[in-house]
Amino acid sequence: MITFQWLIVRVVALFISLTILIDIEMFVVMLSFLIIHISIGLKAIIHDYIHFQKIKLMLLILLRVSAIEISRSFRTFYIIIKNT
């Protein structure tokens, strides 16, 4: 069965394989898609294997916060590289 998550994972994998370091902007886009790919995978694992609702909610919040922090780090990296 094809779901939205299945489709997004495949599209992200396609974009990652097509943007092998063409330039720095494409590298940042590739890393952004990688973050999305990892987040979707970890959300699926959390939903499948964590059965306590409070722990599941806490892990999903931590996952979202960590994805935001990682993307902020990539943005900082991009700004530093772009200015050199």
Swiss-Prot record:
Its cofactor is heme. Its main location: mitochondrion. Keywords: Electron transport, Heme, Iron, Membrane, Metal-binding, Mitochondrion, Mitochondrion inner membrane, Transmembrane, Transmembrane helix, Transport, Tricarboxylic acid cycle. One of its GO terms (cellular component) is mitochondrial inner membrane. GO terms for molecular function: metal ion binding. GO terms for biological process: tricarboxylic acid cycle. Heme binds at residue 37. It is a multi-pass membrane protein. Part of an enzyme complex containing four subunits: a flavoprotein, an iron-sulfur protein, plus two membrane-anchoring proteins. Membrane-anchoring subunit of succinate dehydrogenase (SDH). This is Succinate dehydrogenase membrane anchor subunit. It comes from Chondrus crispus (Carrageen Irish moss).
